[in-house]
Amino acid sequence: MSTLRPFYFMVVFWGAAYRRYFTELLLPSLLSPNNLPGLRRERGNRFLIVTTREDWRAIQEDGMFRLLGTYAEPVWLEMRPPDPGDPKMLVMSRGHRRMAARAFEDRAYGVFLSPEMVFSDGSVATMGRLADAGKKVVLGVAIRFRYETMVPEMERRGHLQPGQPLGIGSRDLMRIALQNLHSETLRYEFDAPWFAEYPVSIYWRVPRGDGIIIHSFSWASLVIDYGALAHHDTSTFENWTVDGNYIFRNFPNPSDIYVVTDSDELALVTFTRESELHFDLVPYLAGRAPWIATWYKLNQIRALKDSEVMDPLKRRIFPTPVYLHASEVSPVWDTTRLRVARLIKRACEAPGRIDKLVALLLALTAPDLGTRLLGAFGGRFAFVLWAWRYRRFVWQRLKERGGLAAGRSRLDDGRDWASPALGPMNPIWSLRSLLREKVLQTPSSVRQRAALPTSGSDQLLDREATGAGGPSERDESVIHSERSR
């Protein structure tokens, strides 16, 4: 295998905002001394850019873009300006498909980029070294960082200066980045009370706060050896994105995949503005018993891992830990590492009878978590949980059918069918309430509880439960959007 085959760096963007990201973030980081300038020019490296005619013309006089031509040939692939209603992700996928086809045709090494990326100095040199060592695919973990606070901090520290290459070491980059996680990423912290419903990444902080251990289903494709492919499958780009099942369709063998497991080797940051994408950190697990919170979180990880969204390759890679850190990985990490390994092992095991019994117990004793558990178990067990969760609704319908109760009016559709209330239909919850609130001694507390407003999550469940005669299932597209962000 020739070591002089070219690298094709590939990016899609349009519009003034992303054009600035390209010229002020991505290009300066790639032009640091040990990135693009460190690749041998004899390779004939190219930089494929899918963008509009307006954006292509606008970058011609930019200093960083002119410097790019010294190390890689810019190649423009014109795209028409997207219509306002065009799905952004699919527009990007069309561009990725064109560039991937060009890289396959030329037997090049492909590097998929986004304009809001920043790489540590030496990252591209690492890509070249791994490609020359015969690695067919190199993947790096991809999570979001907060643009509004991290970019000003890089400027304040002197790393990011207008019109200059951005030469920042991996530990300096991680030192800033780990203090500026985006709200989406904050929801992936395992020990947080606002743990994500669809955790595409899961991380744990280590002592002293200068590092995290992360396991992920979301990866950036940093090197793809198109010369190793006899056939190129681009069907993923028809209705999905490059971080879907594109790698699995072309490189299904896990032995072909190299995962960057240490930020010292290669570090990248992807910025997102909170003003463009924001998640409220709702501490719905606060106050839960630790064993309940842990079991629930492991259940959510397992459910996502085993869902149709995940391909076999992502499931195989998921147990691989990745270390992002700003100082040495020292023995103080050991306790966290051992704990993480135990938890990931449990998450990767198939749910047994005990898990199902715990799910049933939580559905009985923690009604607000009941609906979240429905999607994790299939078949009859899911139906049992569903029936118990909405037993008040089912009981009311049965009474209506039997002539024991009047039909619901439109006002009745606002009832809280999901939240429990004192009564024989909710025996366990009622008993717990009696003991906790001492209702027998203070009858007024019953009236006080009845007057309490329902929570926002329960109101949402009400709308789902009553909008079409009963509760509706969560649309699977939510999982797709959680994965693709």
Language model features by range: what are they?
Residues 6-11, 30, 46-49:
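Hydrophobic targeting segments
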Residues 219-373:
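Long C-terminal appendages of very large multidomain proteins
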Residues 106-118:
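Short beta-strand-to-loop acidic/aromatic patch adjacent to the donor-nucleotide binding site
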Residues 17-37:
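Short, well-formed alpha-helical segments that are part of the catalytic scaffolds
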